[in-house]
């Protein structure tokens, strides 16, 4: 076997648009510096079993145009070599047998953790860097830095939602669109806000330790009632799939239409959140005499292997170049990032959450101006609705309830509502989400009340 220095590249986790651009950029940089590059097929799958035959030499001719395409040129796998000490040992030994002294891993938080443990186990024999990838956008990067693939996934998700919104209006129905994002609501919120969905629900907005299923259902019901009072029978809610992980398992266990294991426990991963909410919302509307057609739709898999849009192609070219250049310059044990147009290596040790021992997860900041603006454009029951007797009377009449009855049913929904938007002239006119104050040009009473009654979705 040749003793020439070798750089290995592998991809873990789920697909994301832009993977091939990272592979291509890193390969070109390394080859031009005289280093052989091998693509390791199917992530850690074969290495962890001690197999070294599933590799392919990457050349500039092979990869020079793959950046236009989605998917992964060298495959992908969710195999986790850290689950068993022997698998991690096999992975290190397999890489050494392949004469790989430098490794680029491409993946999300789980692959980042595997990269950390692999580098630690290799003890200087293999230098490792990680390129963050996930359409969930939940890796612990600065708030203004996206993970690659997110923008392409959002772009394609918005196209899907746009068409569904037209269908909803045409057919007078509601869509419950469940978007990928098991740990954070970035993708759901990004799609919903950009598309102008009627409302978007993410796990971060429910601040209790456990999400009450009734609160999720009533938020959707309140939106339907409010929308109907404006003369619109249609709407579209974008819902982050991660909500299901926060719902009390005992509430899910009480449902009839969920999959269970041999011991009768609910299979969380198999919960069809859209269908469950569709059934519960329809049932909740019955006492109010409201009938509406609801269609549940999952989107996610059709986003993961989309061809990357130019912003992700350019971004991943930067990441791939920097990953290879950093290793070739003697660097080790960092996650690659681009911040403000500059390469910023983030040491592995800074990625770990001391409480979990795993890579940190970046959640949606529900106290940010971006989120506050998103909330103001949603049609859902708000605090100012309950303070306006005329509006409240319309909603109560639509539900066939008195004002007091409507309050008893729904006013608990506003307990954790973020404060309204204000302009702070003391900070150069920056918009902040905080309670209105005397003398502020925008207080709760004058804040944007959302789209006009007959406005778009």
List where the protein language model places each region:
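N-terminal phosphate-binding or glycine-rich loops at protein starts, especially the Walker A/P-loop
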Residues: 2-51
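A short, small-residue-rich loop immediately preceding and capping a beta-strand
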Residues: 6-14, 19, 100-110, 176-177
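Short, ordered loop/turn segments at secondary-structure junctions
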Residues: 12-14, 35, 40-45, 78-79, ...
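Short glycine/serine/threonine-rich phosphate/pyrophosphate-binding segments
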Residues: 16-26, 47-48, 85-87, 106-116, ...
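Accessory alpha-helical/coil subdomains and C-terminal extensions
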Residues: 37, 94, 102-107, 113-117, ...
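Glycine-rich oxoanion-binding loops at beta->alpha junctions
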Residues: 48-101, 111, 135, 145-159
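C-terminal non-catalytic interaction/assembly regions of soluble proteins
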Residues: 252-445
């Amino acid at each position: 076997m040749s003793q020439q220095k070798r750089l290995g590249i592998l991809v873990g986790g789920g697909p994301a648009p832009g993977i091939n651009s990272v592979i291509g950029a890193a390969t070109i940089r390394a080859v031009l510096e005289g280093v052989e590059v091998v693509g390791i097929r199917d992530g850690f799958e074969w290495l962890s079993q001690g197999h070294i035959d599933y590799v392919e030499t990457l050349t500039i001719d092979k990869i020079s145009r793959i950046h236009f395409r989605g998917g992964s040129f060298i495959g992908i796998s969710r195999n986790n070599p850290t689950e068993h000490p022997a698998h991690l040992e096999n992975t290190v030994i397999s890489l050494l047998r392949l004469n790989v002294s430098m490794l680029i891993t491409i993946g999300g938080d789980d692959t980042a953790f595997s990269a950390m443990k692999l580098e630690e186990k290799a003890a200087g024999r293999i230098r490792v860097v990680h390129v963050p990838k996930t359409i969930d956008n939940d890796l612990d990067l600065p708030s203004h830095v996206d993970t690659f693939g997110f923008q392409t996934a959002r772009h394609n998700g918005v196209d899907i939602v746009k068409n569904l919104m037209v269908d909803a209006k045409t057919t007078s129905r509601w869509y419950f669109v469940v978007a990928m994002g098991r740990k954070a609501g970035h993708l759901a919120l990004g799609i919903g806000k950009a598309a102008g969905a009627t409302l978007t629900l993410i796990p971060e907005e429910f601040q209790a330790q456990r999400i009450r299923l009734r609160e999720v259902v009533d938020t959707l019901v309140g939106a339907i009632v409010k929308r109907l009072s404006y003369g619109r029978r249609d709407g579209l809610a974008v819902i982050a799939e991660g909500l299901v992980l926060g719902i009390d398992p005992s509430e899910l266990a009480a449902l009839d239409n969920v999959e269970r294991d041999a011991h009768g426990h609910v299979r969380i991963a198999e919960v069809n959140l859209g269908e469950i909410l569709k059934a519960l919302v329809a049932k909740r509307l019955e006492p109010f005499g409201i009938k509406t057609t609801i269609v549940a739709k999952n989107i996610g898999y059709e986003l993961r292997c989309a061809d990357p849009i130019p912003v992700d192609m350019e971004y991943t070219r930067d990441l791939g170049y920097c990953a290879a250049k950093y290793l070739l310059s003697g660097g080790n044990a960092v996650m690659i990032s681009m911040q403000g147009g500059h390469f910023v290596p983030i040491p592995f040790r800074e990625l770990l959450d001391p409480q979990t021992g795993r890579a940190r997860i970046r959640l949606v900041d529900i106290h940010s101006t971006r989120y506050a603006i998103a909330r103001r454009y949603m049609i859902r029951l708000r605090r100012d609705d309950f303070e306006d007797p005329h509006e409240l009377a319309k909603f109560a009449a639509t539900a066939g309830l008195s004002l007091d009855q409507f309050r008893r049913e729904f006013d608990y929904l506003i307990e954790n509502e973020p404060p309204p938007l204000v302009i702070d002239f003391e900070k150069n006119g920056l918009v902040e989400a905080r309670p209105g104050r005397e003398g502020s040009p925008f207080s709760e009473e004058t804040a944007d009340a959302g789209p006009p009654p007959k406005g778009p979705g």
